[in-house]
Amino acid sequence: MVSEISLPLKRQRYVILGLLLAVAAAAWGILIWQSVVDGQSMGPGMNMQALLFLIIWVDMMVAMMFPTAAPMILTFHRVQVEKRQRGQSFVSTWVFVAAYLLIWTLFGAVAFAAASGIQLVMKLSMLSMETTSRLGGLVLICAGIYQLTPLKTVCLTKCQTPMSFILTSWRDGVRGAFWMGAKHGAYCLGCCWLLFVILFPIGIMNVAAMAVITALIFAEKSLPFGRRIGQIAALGLIAYGLLAVLVPGMLPTNMQSPSGM
């Protein structure tokens, strides 16, 4: 890999951005291939064990979140380079990235455990397909409502303003960089977590749904009217959820057990 220190700042930014986008593109390629092999709209019940689920989850996070996190990552790197030019310590940007990704990986583990527990209860309760579809609709409604909450707004604002985050959350050293990456990952998680949860009823390997969610997250974070787009999406999620509750079978798939059926 090209050294971050040996290149001018502008070229370094291009290298880092290129690597982020290349990794994201490769992740998308793997997801598309996996969806063709296993079925695009499969729910979490794909006969997956925890490790396989986490591997696919991390791949999905890289594909969907790296492009939207790029402005923050590049801002962090620029500040680190400026510190080095002043003779201060330099920390690799990839420490920040690793911590950011760790937060999403931990969330994937929690999501897997929660989905496994919920699906075990559903299986023991012998719920009908109509009931599971309605539960999926409720997940969509909750995701839509969350889009309109103050907590969502606070987390989104933190994700939209990289320099503000730098000024209010900066810490020196490797531990500081790791802490900052984890904190920014937590803000992104707070902003987007329910948008990922809806993949469970819609289909964990539904590439079309992943593409729409990625576009929504990018628009929310990057466009001047991103907040308005998020509010419109919230109304759409609530409407779709209500439709799934009232008309069972409207979802591409029903939630199944992550550990298999």
Region locations from a protein language model:
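Histidine-/acidic- and/or cysteine-rich, low-complexity loops and terminal segments associated
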Residues: 1-59, 81-85, 122-128, 150-171, ...
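Juxtamembrane transmembrane-helix termini in multi-pass membrane transport proteins
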Residues: 6, 54-101
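Residue-level signature of transmembrane alpha-helical entry/exit and packing/kink sites
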Residues: 16-20, 49-53, 92, 96, ...
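Residues within membrane-spanning alpha-helices of integral membrane proteins
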Residues: 17, 21-24, 97, 136-140, ...
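Alpha-helical transmembrane segments
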Residues: 48-65, 129-145
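A small-residue-rich subset of transmembrane alpha-helices
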Residues: 87-117, 191-225, 231-237
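Transmembrane alpha-helix/helix-exit interface in multi-pass inner-membrane proteins
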Residues: 105-120, 132-161
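Alpha-helical transmembrane segments of helical membrane proteins, especially in multi-pass transport
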Residues: 146-154, 176-204
